[in-house]
Design a protein with these regions (language model features):
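Secondary-structure transition motif
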Residues: 1-137
């Protein structure tokens, strides 16, 4: 199974389909390695380094969406939202920015189903574009 993922290492975004990257997961600890010309792989990022974040793709084949993406969505009154995984309902949702900021990652999200929300466009992510979250209060 080829699952879409990406990793923010605190400075750069690395995608699962980048050349020579391998993601290793054991229990809840993960490490992203890069193979350098057949030598010992270099550690690119890890769940234990205190700055890196692993984000899974939503699995929707017609949309390239990842946990943490900031999207503009709606039909007439466009607004910004954040793609979040709701651990209580086991699904990805589009969470309005204000709700995202208030919840601060507690796992249960009030938001909209991605499948029912059209159209939407990725305009950034919470790590590389935090300024897109400003002004929502």
């Amino acid at each position: 199974m080829n699952t879409a993922y990406r990793v923010w290492d605190g400075e750069n975004m690395h995608y699962g389909d980048d050349v020579n990257l391998t993601l290793f997961i054991r229990d809840k600890v993960w490490t992203l390695y890069k193979d350098s010309a057949g030598l010992c792989p270099d550690i690119v990022a890890s769940s234990q380094d205190g700055k890196s974040v692993l984000m899974w793709g939503t699995g929707l084949k017609d949309k390239s969406l990842y946990d943490g993406d900031i999207v503009k969505y709606g039909t007439f009154n466009y607004q910004n939202g954040v793609i979040c995984y709701d651990t209580h309902q086991a699904t990805f949702k589009i969470v309005p920015v204000l709700f995202y900021l208030e919840n601060a990652g507690n796992g249960g999200w009030t938001g909209n189903s991605i499948r029912k929300t059209v159209p939407l466009k990725v305009i950034g992510d919470v790590y590389q574009n935090p300024e897109l979250l400003e002004g929502a209060e």
